Amino acid sequence: MKEVIHEMYSKEQIDQMVTEIATRINKDYEGKQIHMICILRGSVFFCADLAKKITVPVSMDFMAASSYGNEVKSSGQLMITKDLDDDIDGRHCLIVEDIIDSGNTLSKICGLLAARNPASLKIATLLDKPDRREVDVEVDLSLIHISEPTRRS
């Protein structure tokens, strides 16, 4: 049987949500420069779309991390496969992620980056699944919240 996929949001709706988040970022960072940290690979297009709508000065860097290695199941150990090229000491950093569910990997990334003394460290995500959290991660900006459906007994 062929699976039917239903569109939840149109391209135009998503574009409008990106504009709304960019407007909030512009207000929150007025008079400051943002250093966007794009978590590879999933967030590349979201990060690019967001950066185009931000009017305050922006620089961008990339980080790739995995807790899976060559396994199908997470090992729980964070492996940085591509670290930042730039020093973030004293900079206002915005981590841009595509999907946040358990929060495990992102929590470890935040701890690693916080130890590098940024002036501020915030998180923006395209898709947030707070019901799936295994660790506490404060998401500052999210486009879409997905709640797990309640299962019937």
Tell me what each language-model feature is.
Residues 61-65, 119-132:
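ATP-dependent adenylation/pyrophosphate-handling site
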Residues 144-153:
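Single conserved hydrophobic/aromatic residue that forms the stacking wall/gate
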Residues 6, 26-28, 52, 70, ...:
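Short secondary-structure boundary/capping segments
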Residues 26-70:
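Conserved PRPP/pyrophosphate-binding segment of the phosphoribosyltransferase/PRPP-pathway fold
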Residues 87-126:
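Internal catalytic-core helix/loop-beta-alpha segment
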Residues 18, 57-93, 104-107, 133-136:
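Short, glycine/charge-rich flexible loops or terminal/linker lids adjacent to PRPP-binding catalytic cores
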Residues 14, 36, 64, 95-98:
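Generic structural signal for small/hydrophobic residues in well-ordered secondary structure
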Residues 1-33:
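Active-site-facing substrate-recognition patch
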